Amino acid sequence: MDGTIKEALSVVSDDQSLFDSAYGASSHLSKADMTASANPDYGQPHKINPIPPQQDWINQPMRVNIKREYEHMNGSRESPVDCSINKCSKLIGGSEGNAMTYTYMDEKNGPPPPNMTTNERRVIVPADPALWSQDHVRQWLEWAIKEYGLVEIDCSLFQNIDGKELCKMSKEDFLRSTSIYNTEVLLSHLNYLRDSSSSLGYNTQAHTDQSSRLTAKEDPSYEAVRRSGWGNSMSSPVTKSPPMGGTQNVNKSGDQQRSQPDPYQILGPTSSRLANPGSGQIQLWQFLLELLSDSSNASCITWEGTNGEFKMTDPDEVARRWGERKSKPNMNYDKLSRALRYYYDKSIMTKVHGKRYAYKFDFHGIAQALQPHPTDTSMYKYPSEFSYMPSYHSHQQKVNFVPSHPSSMPVTSSGFFGATSPYWNSPSANIYPNPNVPRHPNTHVQSHLGGFY
């Protein structure tokens, strides 16, 4: 009876161990003792207890315990899975906008197993190798040695080399310091970093060294050069010449001069057209425009801008040339300036106040002066061309032209001169024997006009 109960308990205990994962290694010893005290007819105890499945069931809880013990020992709650051992983690970010983070192990007592976490060291360098300092180059070499397992590299040969010099080194320069295998690895990774920084649009001017920044910012035109993108070198503060497509100039005064158009190109054709007097005689203002239309006369007269203002740089020479044109050898600037005042009232030109020998053309006034004015044709017409004037002697017709008094002046047949003059053949004769002369109706011109003569 006692043997049957023990056998049943042994079977139940063994079945529970298959499904209950809370049973640990300490419970197996008691189970084995219970089985050993049972009837030996059931065979060996290890054949009844499924020990291999129990090992599989308890494997995972043991791993969790290992992680927790590690966290407790180091005082950190970071999971060891977050740390990479075999490969470096490259991160873009950090304190600077573009930086690479390299992670490698500190080997103290030999290389650790690949499934265990060790203390790691991070190296943060700029993304562009050309901006590396000497310390960055050294850290990069140390990382490459740890990462790729490189040997036979003398780091002392790279002590005084910064990022610029490193990028300029050729394959032969690397071969002088290390083997061909190490050279291929280092150059491949260096080229990869350079290509990555260029694809990210990395701005090399933003990370120049402090000395070059101070030197460049002392010049006030540095900002204009940097913003316009004309700075081709990181160390040179000012470029000598901007590109063809540039829209800003380094020198502000030069920018203003280049922005103003050439007055001779703008006012030259207008000056030549207005200076042409045609068939008539040339006037003084036209002569001045003739001189201003040619830039070779700038030694004596020149434009001041494009608004019509000009200045006589040599007024005596201008007066002498005007005297030669008009055949007046005694011409001087005083006489010429008095002649110019005549054009003030005609709105052809004005005197620029505050400037000596400076005048200004009024092209609107010149256009008004050159327009043909409509003349009164009545001043040039004969009286016979008007409908209300019948003859050349209008004063005789006005004597009897009284619209308010329809009755005519009573006269005798003998006329004003008494007896008939022998010069007149008939009383009806008049001074206009031609019948084609236009006459007004009889109400205005009486038929007795012939009796007056």
Swiss-Prot record:
InterPro entries: Ets_dom, ETS_fam, Pointed_dom, SAM/pointed_sf, SAM_PNT-FLI-1, WH-like_DNA-bd_sf, WH_DNA-bd_sf. Keywords: Activator, DNA-binding, Nucleus, Transcription, Transcription regulation. Residues 282-362 bind DNA. Residues 201-273 are annotated as: Disordered. Residues 111-197 form the PNT domain. One of its GO terms (cellular component) is nucleus. Gene3D superfamilies: Transcription Factor, Ets-1, Winged helix-like DNA-binding domain superfamily/Winged helix DNA-binding domain. The keyword Transmembrane does not apply. Belongs to the ETS family. This is Retroviral integration site protein Fli-1 homolog. It comes from Xenopus laevis.
